[in-house]
Amino acid sequence: MTIILKPGSVPLETLEKIYREGLPVRIDPAFHAGIEKAAARIAEIAAGDAPVYGINTGFGKLASIRIAAGDVATLQRNLILSHCCGVGEPLSENIVRLIMALKLVSLGRGASGVRLEVITLIEAMLEKGVIPMIPEKGSVGASGDLAPLAHMTAAMIGEGEAFYRGERLSGAKALGKAGLKPVVLAAKEGLALINGTQTSTALALAGLFRAHRAVRTALITGALSTDAAMGSDAPFHEEIHQLRGHKGQIDAGRALRTLLEGSAIRRSHLEGDQRVQDPYCIRCQPQVDGACLDILRQAARTLEIEANAVTDNPLVLSDGRAVSGGNFHAEPVAFAADQIALAVCEIGAISQRRIALLVDPSLSFGLPAFLARKPGLNSGLMIAEVTSAALMSENNQMAHPASVDSTPTSANQEDHVSMACHGARRLLQMTANLNAIIGIEALTGALGVELRKPLTTSAELAKVIAALRAKVAALEEDRYMADDLKAAAELVADGTLSGVISAGILPDLET
């Protein structure tokens, strides 16, 4: 299945499909005429006498140097090779595929001036599985993601490296094995390919998709913990949240209320329970997870706009002029990444407190210490809780806003930058930590519910426990725990736990 992209109106759901499923993409042919028109205009400018940045001039601080017409192709090739300065491990294939798809969307709007053959090469590389090797580090998020996108473009011109069928090869060999030929870049094409926010945006989108799946699963594990602790569902009453009015809070409260519906555990303590109120980690779940959901939705709106944006420079305007601007500055992406990081921290923080509550016999309303069936002889989930605390603290340290940092580059020509790329990249590690925390809560919550037998939980939560138990057996006595934690985290990350919940219960991003 090939996804047909309509530049300027590609929805988040399509971008998530590209990220998660690695499907090939193509630009809607209806956009080809506009692409060719802008390319023809760039060719006219290149043949003329007027200096235009990036077409017949140097780059950055060297913009005042005029380039002869005969050197225009060499200029573009030199630009790519000189900007291949990335360091670190290669970005994963699904991230690079998303980067390439976003670049197609940007170029496809017909304001960049690249020829159609550049577009079709990117499409063919995605279809045949030629994935450029892009190092993870080296971008400051303005003037675009220069180094990462230079590595992408290097493979297109037969330089650099690329992966093909799991093998890391030179760019030329990877193209050759796939039956493709490198492109010779014309005027401005190298600049159009490397000048843009596609790397930062792809990383931020990946973080968003992972965080959204995590918060949906955290609502499930939070409901499990509520039932395991014999907590009250009264704080999830719809009118409470309507009186405050925040959409995320309303949606989170409704989800928690529905997930707990029909629980025999809950019915067992409706009368005669001497506790007046539950701790905040139980009672305030709608307020905390709902606020996180709202901030993820705000970031989603920003990133959907950015994914459809034209972010190179100069741009070919509708009147045919090539005008320099600053759309390559990734400040909106940096802000969105910082917002996502804050949400990831808080989802994990309140989840960790519920884990701590369930393993503490002074708080868990009758559950054994550390959920061990024979406390003392067995330590149960004692150190799993410690691990969740370590992961929470690590995420807190990584949440420092990247967007507040800036440093001048390129001889002060590029004197304020966004730091969006590493601000977005850290979300991959943060969401991996979050998945592990929520996975641990799934283990504690499920075991806590099982220890309440013969009382049973709700039908929805019973499905979650069954999905968990298909991969992780209930803890009867101490055993090697690392595999359990890994399996539980994977069930969060791959959507297994959230996938068993009936449609319409868990909240969407709703951009």
From Swiss-Prot:
Pfam family, one: Lyase_aromatic
Subcellular location: Cytoplasm
Keyword field: Cytoplasm, Histidine metabolism, Lyase
EC number: 4.3.1.3
Disulphides: none
PROSITE patterns according to UniProt: PAL_HISTIDASE
GO BP annotation list: L-histidine catabolic process to glutamate and formamide; L-histidine catabolic process to glutamate and formate
Any single Gene Ontology cellular-component annotation: cytoplasm
CDD domains listed in its UniProt record: PAL-HAL
Superkingdom of the organism of origin: Bacteria
Catalytic activity: L-histidine = trans-urocanate + NH4(+)
Pathway, per record: Amino-acid degradation; L-histidine degradation into L-glutamate; N-formimidoyl-L-glutamate from L-histidine: step 1/3
PANTHER family in the cross-refs: HISTIDINE AMMONIA-LYASE
Listed name of the protein: Histidine ammonia-lyase
Organism: Brucella suis (strain ATCC 23445 / NCTC 10510)
